[in-house]
């Protein structure tokens, strides 16, 4: 259904956003940007 599709899109967007935040944090913490 539509709700399931929207939910999957939000989950996918959240995962990719979280991954980029984690990458930024780890590179700043290790001074390896």
UniProtKB/Swiss-Prot annotation:
Record bears the keyword Cell division: no
Compartmental location: Secreted
GO cellular component terms given for this protein: extracellular region
Superkingdom of this protein's organism: Eukaryota
Tissue: Expressed by the skin glands.
Keywords linked to the UniProt accession: Antibiotic, Antimicrobial, Secreted
GO BP annotations, alphabetical order: defense response to Gram-negative bacterium; defense response to Gram-positive bacterium; killing of cells of another organism
Pfam hit, one: Antimicrobial_2
Family: Belongs to the frog skin active peptide (FSAP) family. Brevinin subfamily.
Primary role: Antimicrobial peptide active against the Gram-positive bacterium S.aureus (MIC=25 uM) and against the Gram-negative bacteria E.coli (MIC=6 uM). Has no antifungal activity against C.albicans. Shows hemolytic activity against human erythrocytes only at high concentrations (LC(50)=180 uM).
Protein name in the entry: Brevinin-2GRb
Organism whose genome encodes this protein: Odorrana grahami (Yunnanfu frog)
């Amino acid at each position: 259904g539509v709700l399931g599709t929207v939910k999957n899109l939000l989950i996918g967007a959240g995962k990719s956003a979280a991954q980029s935040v984690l990458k930024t944090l780890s590179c700043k913490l290790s001074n390896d940007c």
